[in-house]
Amino acid sequence: MIGKVVVSVASILLIVGVAIGVVAFINKNGDANLSPQMKAVQGICQSTSDKASCVKTLEPVKSEDPNKLIKAFMLATKDELTKSSNFTGQTEVNMGSSISPNNKAVLDYCKRVFMYALEDLATIIEEMGEDLSQIGSKIDQLKQWLIGVYNYQTDCLDDIEEDDLRKAIGEGIANSKILTTNAIDIFHTVVSAMAKINNKVDDLKNMTGGIPTPGAPPVVDESPVADPDGPARRLLEDIDETGIPTWVSGADRKLMAKAGRGRRGGRGGGARVRTNFVVAKDGSGQFKTVQQAVDACPENNRGRCIIYIKAGLYREQVIIPKKKNNIFMFGDGARKTVISYNRSVALSRGTTTSLSATVQVESEGFMAKWMGFKNTAGPMGHQAAAIRVNGDRAVIFNCRFDGYQDTLYVNNGRQFYRNCVVSGTVDFIFGKSATVIQNTLIVVRKGSKGQYNTVTADGNELGLGMKIGIVLQNCRIVPDRKLTPERLTVATYLGRPWKKFSTTVIMSTEMGDLIRPEGWKIWDGESFHKSCRYVEYNNRGPGAFANRRVNWAKVARSAAEVNGFTAANWLGPINWIQEANVPVTIGL
C-alpha cells in the first residue's frame, strides 16, 4: 500500500519546494495551467498510495498553504474515522439480541480501538501546530502515533472470525483506512521534509526508506543468552554501562538499573526502589491483586507509577488502560512472580485474540522487569496470548512469556525486549509494531498432533518504507523438553508472512536443528511471500541453513544490508540515544 512512499530524492525536493514556498510543483504532464492551489495539492499528494483520493479530499480546500492543506487533510481523516467508529457501533445495534457472544465481544473491542484511534488523531492534530516546519523532534512521535491510528482499525478487522461480518466491517471502514494510509504517506514524505529542511538536515535517506550508510563490521556476542532468573549481562549495542537501552530516559534507566529482584535492586544489592504500590498475595502489601495496583495508578501520569509485585502466582487477567501510562512493574524473578490466566479464542466464550491476553497493555511507556506472564489455555485453545502490548516505547527486561499460539503479541508502537524467555508453538511472536528482541531464549513447544510451529508472524501491511517489523538479535532458538525427541519430525519454521509487507530480521542468532532447512513458511491461501521482507544475517548453529532457504527470503552477506535493523535505527529516532549523553554504537 505504501510502496509508493519510496520516491526519488529529487521528487522529495520538489515537494519540499512547494512546502516551503521555494519552487512550484509542475505535475508529471507538465501542465503549467494548474492553479497555485492545485499545484500545491498535486505536490502533497504525489507520493500517497491513493493519489486520486488524496486530491479529491484536498481539492475543495481554498488555500495553497501546505500547512493549511495538510491540516485540512488530517481533519478530513478524523471525519472519516468518526464515520467508521459510528458504523461499527451501529452494526452491533443492527444485529440486535441475536448477536453471538464472539461477535458482540469483537464489536465492543472495535468501538474501543476506534475511540483510541480518534483520541490519538486528535492529539496529532493538536501537536501539529500552525507551522509544520517547526515540528522538530516531534515528527517521529507523531508518525508513530499515526501508524497506530491505522493499526487500531486493522485490529478491529483482525479479531473478527466470522467471514460475513469481517467483510461488512471492512467495507464500512475502507475510506478511513485509505485516508489514514495517505496521511501516513504525507507525514513520511512532505512533513518529514519540511521538518528536516527547517533543521538544515541534508540527509534524505530516511525519507526514502533507503538503508542507512553501513557502520563498522559487526561484532557478534558469542556468549550464551542469559537466563532471566540469572545475573544480568551486557547487550550488543544501544546499551549503556548499566545494561539499559540509551533511548530510555535518564530517570528510567536509573530506575531499571536499581530494580533487581525484589525491592532491593542493583547487582550488589542494598539499593532500594521507592515504589508507589506493593502487591502481595499474603496481604503484606497495599493490594492482593495486580489489577488493584494498576487501577490505583494515576491517569495521564507525567512520572512513573512503580508497582512491586511480591513472589506468587497471580491468577488474574490484568488490563492496563490507555490513560494509565508510564507504569513500571517488577517482581522477584521471572519464575517467582507470575501473572497467569486461561483465556483463548477456541475455548473461552466471547473472546478474541486481543482479548485473550493475560496482560493487556494499552498505554504508553510500559516497563517490566523480573516478571513472568503466562497463558495456560494450551494448544487446543488456539489464539491465547500471554501479553499484548499496544503502547509505544515499551521496555521489558528479564521477563518470561509462556503460551502456545500467539504468546507474545507485540501489537503496536516501538518495543524493546532484552534477556527474556518466550515459549510457544504457532506465530508466538507476532504483531504490527517496531520490535527488537535481544539476548532472548526462544523455546519452541510441542503443540497439537500434526501441528507445525512458526516462531514469528509480522503484520506490516503499510509498506517496506515503514518501521514495522520484528528483529531478533543474538537470541537462541531451541526446542523444549517435550518437543526435543520429535524436533526433527515436527516442522518448525522461523516465521510466516501474516500481512503483505511482513518484515522479520534474524541476526547473530543461534538456531537449533529443529529449524527446517527452508527456514520460512508461506501463509496458506495468500501470496504475501512475494512482497514480504525476510532477512537472516550472521546466524549460527545447525538450523542456520544459509544455502537452503526459500528463494523469497534473503540471507544478507554484509552489515550494510541489516544496519537499518539495529536497535538504534529500528527503534529511532537517533536523538533518543544522543539525548542520553552516553557512548553508543550506531551500527552492528
Curated annotation (Swiss-Prot):
Pathway: Glycan metabolism; pectin degradation; 2-dehydro-3-deoxy-D-gluconate from pectin: step 1/5. Gene3D superfamilies: Invertase/pectin methylesterase inhibitor family protein, Single-stranded right-handed beta-helix, Pectin lyase-like. SMART domains: PMEI (SM00856). Expressed in pollen grains and pollen tubes. Substrate binds at T353, Q383, R496, W498. The active site is at D406 (proton donor), D427 (nucleophile). It is found in: Secreted, Cell wall. Keywords: Aspartyl esterase, Cell wall, Cell wall biogenesis/degradation, Glycoprotein, Hydrolase, Secreted, Signal. Its EC number is 3.1.1.11. It comes from the Eukaryota. The keyword Aminoacyl-tRNA synthetase does not apply. Residues 1-24 form the signal peptide. The record marks Q405 as: Transition state stabilizer. Acts in the modification of cell walls via demethylesterification of cell wall pectin. Plays an important role in growth of pollen tubes in female floral tissues, possibly via enhancing the interaction between the pollen tube and female floral tissues by modification of the cell walls. This is Pectinesterase 4. The gene is PME4.
